[in-house]
């Protein structure tokens, strides 16, 4: 499976998370996953909350449309984005 998979109602993203980064950004490919750097620390779910907020902003969807399907407690996550209004260029390249 590639880092980004298109489904009938959205996208499934396989992510590698880098917490406590200097800024929030989609870095690029990391093996067969998309690397995302976020500023939040991996403490008490702060990184997950921040990640959902960041992904929702990047894809212009509500936070409720970003679902962590796998990897709640680790760096390797699978996230579903339901009906994205916009797709960031870093992700568009992987869809082609």
Swiss-Prot record:
SMART domains in the cross-refs: DUF167
Domain of life: Bacteria
PANTHER family assigned: UPF0235 PROTEIN C15ORF40
Protein's name in the database: UPF0235 protein YPO0944/y3330/YP_3498
Transmembrane segments: none
Family: Belongs to the UPF0235 family.
GO CC field: cytoplasm
Source organism of this protein record: Yersinia pestis
Gene3D superfamilies per record: YggU-like
Pfam families, A to Z: DUF167
Cited HAMAP family: UPF0235 (MF_00634)
SUPFAM superfamilies given in the database record: YggU-like (SSF69786)
